[in-house]
Amino acid sequence: MQKITHWQEYKIEAKSLILLSLPILLAQIAQNSMGLVDTIMAGRVSAADMAAISVGASIWMPLVLFGQGLLLALPPTISYLNGSAQRHRIAHQVRQGIWIILFSIVPLALLIYHSDTVINRMGMEEHLAQITIKYLHAMLFGLPAYLLLVNFRCLNDGLAKTKPAMIITLIGLLLNIPLNYIFIYGKLGVPAFGAVGCGIATTIVNWIMCILMISYTKSARNQRDLKVFENIIELPNPATLKKLFKLGLPIAIAICSEVALFALTSLLLSPLGTNAVASHQIALNTSSFIFMLPMSLGMATTILVGQSLGERSPLKAKDISYVALFIGLATATLTAFLTVVLRYQIAGIFVKDTEVISLAASLLLLNALYQFSDAVQVVVGGALRGYKDTKAILYITLFCYWVLGMPIGYILSRTDLITAHMGPTGFWIAFVVSLTVAAVLLFYRMYKIQKQSDEQLLTKLEKLK
């Protein structure tokens, strides 16, 4: 029998990572496209309706992402159990995930329902405030469905089955457009709800996607041995919930801190004028789109690293981490090159104002530089989640974003302490600095974990399963 060389192993691992991450990427694109469709279709009603979607999303997203972050403890846990021939324990994790939803949904729902307290103090027009509040209240009915969808998606992702979520999200996107048309503009005898109609349509889509994901999970042949639905309602298990919260809470806080960083940046730039905010938003939108590539790769890395560790193969987990890092940097090289070459054309997609295009193009140069650090920190972060080392991600993220990034950005952007105030350029320089430091620290953390003896590492992971 011919022995497989290291190079052949790397090729196999690279293929596995790409095949696993592509459906995740397409699902992310479809999910983000729903928000884009909502904005465009609401904008055809009025500027106030479009603005309501934007303001509502700025409140909705951090809260929902927190709930989603808690459930992201499931993929590394499930992939580890799957790899270690402990599939009989997977159903228990999924059922306890439902308890995580039940515990988190009450405070999240209350915050969304009473968001009028914040909105009414933002100083916006009364008409806009009322549309935003009604939009969020409509979205609220879809919150349980969305979190249940994430719970069962995490099960499938942990089993390295990423295609179902891709197909279901694409179906959701296709349904979102006609449902928006009916509820926004008032068709088929339904009243015209404007932006609120987007909330109604999204709620319906979330419930449909949730039902489809649960139906797939229940009928999939490769999951019948798990018996997830035999006793779907089980009592909360304090030990399991503690382990899942211990893994998920740092992820949830880290996600929210990142969302909050960019939201606060936009607010701090607002006094500098429309052009500054617009150019920053162009660079941020471009960055968010490109970010889906390393993020998908990072999620695939979590799954395969967790599975390899479950198979008691730390060497394979290490190899997967470095192969993923190579793919991430290779992808960043391509996207950074395209960003630099096409920076004026990219800015021109968003606006026609030459001054805004020029400023946005200069920010996109910094954005191109930032992509390398971003790729490293996202992929290495994915590997660390596979090692179930989520606290390190939280501490490093908080330090780099809030102790380094925000103060440096504010000083360079808004003050003359170091140089003449640089406007949005100052914040983008800070992003490059903070992400580079984060990438170095996260990589060092991964290196330290991988230096542990196999026995020491596997014993620790067994305690966390």
From Swiss-Prot:
CDD domains named in the record: MATE_NorM_like
Entry annotated with the keyword Transport: yes
Membrane-topology descriptor: Multi-pass membrane protein
Keywords: Antiport, Cell inner membrane, Cell membrane, Ion transport, Membrane, Transmembrane, Transmembrane helix, Transport
GO biological process, one term: monoatomic ion transport
Function: Multidrug efflux pump.
Alphabetical list of NCBIfam families matching this protein: matE (TIGR00797)
Protein name, entry field: Probable multidrug resistance protein NorM
Source species: Mannheimia succiniciproducens (strain KCTC 0769BP / MBEL55E)
Designated gene of the protein: norM
